[in-house]
Swiss-Prot record:
The protein's name in its UniProt record: Ubiquinone biosynthesis O-methyltransferase
Native organism taxonomy: Bacteria, Pseudomonadati, Pseudomonadota, Gammaproteobacteria, Pseudomonadales
Repeat as UniProt keyword: no
Listed EC numbers: 2.1.1.222, 2.1.1.64
Pathway assigned to this chain's UniProt record: Cofactor biosynthesis; ubiquinone biosynthesis
Its biological purpose: O-methyltransferase that catalyzes the 2 O-methylation steps in the ubiquinone biosynthetic pathway.
List of residues binding S-adenosyl-L-methionine: 36, 55, 76, 120
Key words, A-Z: Methyltransferase, S-adenosyl-L-methionine, Transferase, Ubiquinone biosynthesis
Entry's family note: Belongs to the methyltransferase superfamily. UbiG/COQ3 family.
InterPro entries per UniProt: SAM-dependent_MTases_sf (IPR029063), UbiG_MeTrfase (IPR010233)
Keyword Transferase: yes
Gene name per UniProt: ubiG
């Protein structure tokens, strides 16, 4: 059975035309993107690296990594976001290989072909996140790095990521997230280790509603990112 939640795909398909509108529902992604890319680039210089972006959507992260000199492949199961991503290349002038394929199928096709794998804001949208993590581990070369980001599962995360972000501040459309699909760092760490990935770093991403700014933080109670390395 394919590890795809068609209802999740449909949500992002419906919004695809607004992906590059910085004042749209995707404004948070645009605002956190520089923080994410800088953090990744600090751990492994992206210039000249072969990178695959899992769940690339409209290409916000993929383009940012290509701008840093990476050779980027972006994969997603949403046809509409991929169309938007390809069209935006005409504006940016970047070269990125976008493909409609699952992480698992790509792993079977191209094992150990990438220096870096990114899987950001994606694991909480699939039925079996552990399967995606295994695919990421297969795709990356020995000694290569895999980066994940997702949302913690606890009362604070429910209050901030769903009640706060979707209902009070209306940063995201209602129904964007399902609390049951949120992932604790301990779970992500266990799945990573089972897949042969060693967790090396974890950092939180917090939002200040007064200043309307995001920053990297030691607080991993809500949004967080993880750096892992494939054991040689």
């Amino acid at each position: 059975m394919s590890n795809v939640d068609h209802a999740e795909i449909a949500k992002f398909e419906a919004l695809a035309h607004r992906w590059w509108d910085r004042e749209s529902e995707f404004k948070p992604l645009h605002e956190i993107n520089p923080l994410r890319v800088n953090w990744i680039d600090e751990h492994i210089s992206l210039a000249g690296k072969k990178v695959i972006d899992i769940g690339c959507g409209g290409g916000i992260l993929s383009e940012a990594m290509a701008q840093r000199g990476a050779q980027v492949t972006g994969i997603d199961m949403g046809e509409a976001p991929l169309s938007v991503a390809r069209l935006h290349l005409l504006e940016s002038g970047l070269e990125i290989d976008y493909r409609q394929i699952t992480a698992e199928a790509m792993a079977a096709e191209a094992p150990e072909q990438f220096d870096v794998v990114t899987c950001l804001e994606m694991l909480e949208h699939v039925p079996d996140p552990a399967s995606v993590i295994r695919a990421c581990a297969t795709l990356v070369k020995p000694g290569g790095q895999v980066f994940f980001s997702t949302i913690n599962r606890n009362p604070k995360a429910y209050a901030f990521a769903i009640i706060g972000a979707e209902y009070v501040l209306q940063l995201l459309p209602r129904g964007t997230h399902d609390f049951k699909k949120f992932i604790r760092p301990s779970e992500l760490g266990a799945w990573s280790r089972d897949a042969g990935l060693a967790v090396k770093d974890i950092i939180g991403l917090t939002y200040n509603p007064l200043t309307k700014h995001y920053k990297l933080s030691a607080d991993v109670d809500v949004n967080y990112m993880v750096q892992t390395v494939k054991e040689s």
